[in-house]
A protein has these predicted regions:
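N-terminal pre-Walker A segment at the start of P-loop NTPase domains
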Residues: 1-28
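A short, well-structured beta->alpha microelement
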Residues: 18-27, 77-100, 105
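A general structural signal for stabilizing positions within well-ordered secondary structure
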Residues: 28-29, 159
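Residues immediately N-terminal to the Walker A/P-loop in ABC ATPase nucleotide-binding domains
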Residues: 32
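AAA+/P-loop NTPase substrate/partner-engagement loops
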Residues: 61-79, 90
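Short beta-strand/turn micro-motifs composed of small residues
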Residues: 66-67, 109, 149, 203
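Phosphate-binding and hydrolysis-coupling loops of NTP-dependent motor/remodeling domains
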Residues: 182-219
């Protein structure tokens, strides 16, 4: 155990800096110069709440929202998003330069597995993968990314995100066990019993650690 807290909400900016989420100045990520999160779980598990908590640490950075969901999520009521129109015309023209022209930013791809238009879905997946691959210090600015999904095993849309995002956020006690084991096997944790936790954040590259409901723990 590295750190014990009463709840995830009590983890401070200083804690995040000490264990690698952000640097000591509070804005720039330590590892790889940017942050990338894959957040997966069923409806109502806490994906939006977790996303909002992460974004709230970076109040001065631009935030783009990519989603096909029309209803406004209450968890995002305090987040000022620039919502991107989910059309072929917009997504075909959108570049990484467009996203970073005003400075460092966040791109949130919310429930990407719900998009039914095959053309839009393909364009969005291409953009999402491009950001993960090339969004680090693009043109002098950085694109941080959060990808949320209902499924841990929708590899057609999220394979690249799963394999390349530095952080996974999972909700073990609300996730199908077989999906959870398949995901954890990728980092050698398939035998770990995480079922008692509501939410686990795993930093899946060096240094390997996870933030559970009550602890930050070295793996």
């Amino acid at each position: 155990m590295i750190l014990a807290v009463n709840s995830f909400d009590e983890i401070t900016r200083e804690d995040l800096a000490e264990y690698g989420l952000i640097n000591s100045r509070g804005l720039l990520p330590v590892y790889g110069e940017r942050l990338s999160f894959f957040i997966a779980g069923p409806p109502g598990c806490g994906k939006s709440v977790t996303t909002a908590q992460i974004l709230s640490l970076f109040p001065d950075q631009i935030k783009y929202l990519f989603t096909d969901i029309k209803e406004k999520d209450r968890a995002f009521q305090d987040i000022e998003f620039r919502r991107v129109r989910m059309t072929k015309e917009v997504l075909e023209k959108l570049t990484l330069d467009d996203l970073t022209k005003e400075g460092d930013c966040w791109c949130v791809f919310d429930d990407v597995d719900k998009i039914r238009n095959p053309t839009v879905s393909k364009l969005l997946t291409t953009l999402m993968d491009n950001i993960i691959a090339n969004g680090r210090s693009h043109g002098g600015n950085t694109i941080n990314i959060i990808v949320t999904s209902h499924s841990l095993s929708d590899y057609k849309r999220t394979k690249y995100s799963i394999e390349n995002c530095d952080y996974w956020v999972i909700f073990p006690n609300k996730t199908i066990k077989s999906q959870l084991i398949t995901l954890l096997k990728k980092i050698g944790l398939e035998k770990a019993d995480l079922s008692r936790y509501n939410r686990v954040i795993i930093h899946r590259s060096t240094p390997l650690f996870m933030i559970t409901d009550l602890f930050i723990t070295e793996i």
